[in-house]
């Protein structure tokens, strides 16, 4: 199938996990794809996996100035944009008393401020019609311990889905979100835990999923393809919860 034939797409955080798998599926659906990342090693691995048809840009997801530079890269490469998947994010999990202002600000800078100012910078380039997909989380809905700041940042994204939908639909720009449950991605390996603690955390989380397992990046990417394509042309301001029943 070529549901995204000739669509120009930007995926932030596209060098690993959900972003990388989404880039793979976008390419398979006929899109022209640019991805961002910060780690040179994962960027090189992504290039080897995806081939030379994908463009990879080093970009800091937390910096508003970097979002303007990224928009300029999109303009130079594509001339405009049909699809944005704002996927870059971090999951910093701590108890309430473990937070300081710097950590709090970093989470919101990457998970909320970055996507907001990227959308702002891309507005002159977004086509009519265009699709924006934000990567939120089931943690915006459930009261899991140690996720207060992470969950709040993802809840902020869901608020943006609704408010930006109301503001941008007149320009033909649809805004929607995917909210994954626990997914087998490198994100969990970035929590700074020992191997034993990481396994314990994973087992605890898996026990809270009615489906009895972690999801796969491909299961999220398929939903993003749908929201990016014309198949979802009447889907505006919506959230797709893909969580194995965790939010029941």
Where do the PLM segments sit?
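Conserved glycine-rich cofactor-binding loop
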Residues: 8, 15-16, 39
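The beta1-alpha1 cofactor-binding region of Rossmann-like NAD(H)/NADP(H)-dependent oxidoreductases
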Residues: 40, 58-69, 101, 219
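Residue(s) in the substrate-gating loop at a strand-loop-helix junction
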Residues: 137
């Amino acid at each position: 199938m070529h549901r995204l034939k000739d669509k120009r797409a930007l995926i932030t955080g596209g060098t690993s996990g959900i972003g990388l798998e989404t880039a793979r599926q976008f390419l398979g659906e006929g899109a022209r794809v640019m991805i961002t990342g910060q780690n040179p090693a994962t960027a090189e691995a992504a290039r080897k996996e995806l081939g030379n048809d994908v463009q990879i840009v080093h970009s800091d997801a937390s910096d508003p100035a970097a979002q303007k530079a990224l928009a300029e890269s999109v303009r130079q490469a594509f001339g405009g944009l049909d699809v944005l998947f704002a996927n870059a994010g971090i999951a910093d999990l701590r108890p309430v008393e473990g937070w300081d202002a710097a950590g709090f600000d970093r989470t919101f800078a990457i998970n909320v401020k970055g996507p907001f100012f990227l959308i702002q910078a891309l507005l002159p380039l977004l086509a009519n019609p265009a699709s924006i997909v934000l990567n939120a989380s089931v943690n915006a809905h459930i009261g899991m311990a140690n996720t207060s700041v992470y969950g709040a940042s993802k809840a902020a994204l869901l608020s943006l889905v609704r408010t930006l939908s109301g503001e941008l639909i007149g320009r033909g720009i649809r805004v929607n979100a995917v909210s994954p449950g626990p997914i087998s991605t490198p994100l969990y390996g970035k929590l700074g835990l020992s191997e034993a603690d990481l396994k314990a955390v994973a087992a605890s989380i898996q026990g809270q999923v009615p489906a009895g397992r972690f999801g796969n990046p491909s299961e999220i990417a398929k939903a993003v393809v749908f929201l990016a394509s014309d198949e979802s042309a009447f889907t505006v301001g919506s959230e797709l919860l893909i969580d194995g029943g965790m939010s029941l």
